[in-house]
């Protein structure tokens, strides 16, 4: 039996959850098997992220992706035709070489990633395997999920500077049971916010976007909601934050402008300590310092790495070279993994492997501009015992991922998943 090869690569312009254009790619093999992928996009982006190719001009506010689509349908299609879909690394490297830039800016990371993801899906389909099995092998575990239920920063139009307030199930249990707890807290939170006199409109990621005065008020609302839903903060449900500190860091004075205060590195650490003391269920912080504030991040890691999970997002941008540098410097103890920050499946998996090898936890992440694509749900299972954040249990583009995880758990027949506990954080 002849091995199937790539016969055609085709892209089209579709729209994401914020009504912005994005790229959908179909990779068709010589035996008729097809793999499809849809590319997400972010509202808050790190300086070192791979570059999305946008059209500019007046059409669709300059955000059209017809150039990226055309690059897939011409150059990339011609280059990949006849290649082995199972050789993911070779396919991805072919596109990187074809692009010829350090940030995938000529062809567009949105074009390259769409093809990379769709190729993996096509190979899995051709091999009659679910994607998580194709990417991950045999011994698999369900991920621990983090749910953004109060939105601030770049994700909402309110007075909260910290970007995300998340809840996570931490009792060792099935994914379904943990997710049901999250849903209960989410609906309880809506009532708590209404009782506090706040609007309960939703942000980009399905979380509420109340016009609160500060982060402490948001954490109090979460703490109260966990208890009112019948759970114990820090035992059943934990809290995590994406500080996204680059967005309240002022480059001119080198200070953090947070909730009416102007803070240096040490004062910002004191601010975080106050939150950690008041809310011991707060167990994970993402990007607590600016992506270029190496001293601040390293000092905070040294003093807090055994107390909380410190997740690097903008600091590493899912880039193996930047992660290697962060590890050498002693920054963080967990890596956030976003496919479109680096632009290929191969480089994403390399970053995950490097993280694990060096004792860093790994958290797979969605973007604020999402689609119904569930690739990241399968990826989170494939990496075995990782973490996943993909928004609140609301808005279909978020819930699609959680429903996919429910399907996977059913297929695996797993009654229990690996859970993250704060006591596990020790990377000395």
Curated annotation (Swiss-Prot):
Cellular component terms per the entry's GO annotation: cell surface; extracellular region; phosphopyruvate hydratase complex
Listed SUPFAM superfamilies: Enolase C-terminal domain-like (SSF51604), Enolase N-terminal domain-like (SSF54826)
Alphabetical UniProt keywords: Cytoplasm, Glycolysis, Lyase, Magnesium, Metal-binding, Secreted
The keyword Zinc-finger is assigned to this record: no
Cofactor(s) required for function per UniProt: Mg(2+)
Catalysed reactions, semicolon-separated: (2R)-2-phosphoglycerate = phosphoenolpyruvate + H2O
Pathway involvement of the protein, from the record: Carbohydrate degradation; glycolysis; pyruvate from D-glyceraldehyde 3-phosphate: step 4/5
Amino acids binding Mg(2+): 242, 286, 313
PANTHER family: ENOLASE (PTHR11902:SF1)
Descriptive protein name: Enolase
Lineage: Bacteria, Bacillati, Bacillota, Bacilli, Lactobacillales
């Amino acid at each position: 039996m002849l091995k199937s090869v790539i016969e055609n690569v085709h892209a089209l312009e579709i729209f994401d959850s914020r009504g912005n254009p994005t790229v959908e790619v179909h990779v068709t093999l010589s035996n008729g098997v097809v793999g499809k992928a849809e590319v997400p996009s972010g509202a808050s982006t790190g300086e070192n992220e791979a570059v999305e190719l946008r059209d500019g001009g007046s059409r669709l506010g300059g955000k059209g992706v017809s150039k990226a689509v055309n690059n897939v349908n011409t150059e990339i299609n011609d280059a990949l035709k006849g290649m082995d879909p199972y050789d993911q690394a070779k396919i991805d490297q072919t596109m990187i070489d074809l692009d010829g830039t350090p940030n995938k800016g000529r062809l567009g990371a949105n074009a390259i990633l769409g093809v990379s993801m769709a190729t993996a899906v096509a190979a899995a389909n051709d091999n009659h395997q679910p994607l998580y099995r194709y990417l991950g092998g045999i011994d698999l575990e369900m991920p621990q999920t983090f749910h953004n239920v109060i939105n601030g920063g770049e994700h909402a139009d309110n007075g909260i500077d910290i970007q995300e307030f998340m809840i996570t199930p931490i009792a060792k249990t099935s994914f379904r049971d943990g997710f049901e707890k999250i849903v209960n807290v989410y609906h309880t939170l809506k009532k708590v916010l209404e009782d506090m006199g706040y609007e309960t409109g939703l942000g980009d990621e399905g979380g509420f976007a109340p016009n609160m005065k500060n982060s402490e008020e948001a954490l109090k609302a979460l703490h109260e909601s966990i208890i009112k839903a019948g759970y114990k903060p820090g035992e059943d449900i934990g809290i995590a934050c994406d500080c996204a500190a680059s967005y309240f860091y002022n480059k001119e004075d080198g200070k953090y402008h947070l909730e009416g205060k102007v803070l240096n590195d040490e004062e910002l650490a004191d601010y975080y300590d106050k939150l950690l003391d008041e809310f011991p269920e707060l167990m994970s912080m993402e990007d607590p310092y600016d992506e270029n504030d190496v001293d601040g991040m390293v000092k905070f890691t040294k003093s807090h790495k055994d107390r909380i999970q410190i997740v690097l997002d903008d600091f590493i941008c899912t880039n193996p070279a930047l992660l290697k540098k962060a590890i050498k410097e002693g920054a963080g103890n967990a890596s956030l993994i976003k496919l479109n920050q680096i632009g290929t499946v191969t480089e994403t998996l390399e970053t995950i492997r490097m993280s694990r090898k060096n004792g860093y936890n790994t958290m797979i992440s969605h973007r604020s501009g999402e689609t119904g694509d569930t690739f990241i749900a399968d990826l989170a299972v494939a990496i075995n015992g990782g973490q996943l954040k993909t928004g609140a249990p609301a808005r279909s583009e978020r819930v699609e991922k959680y429903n996919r995880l429910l399907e996977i758990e059913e297929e695996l027949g797993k009654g229990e998943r690996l859970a993250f506990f704060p006591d596990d954080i020790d990377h000395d």
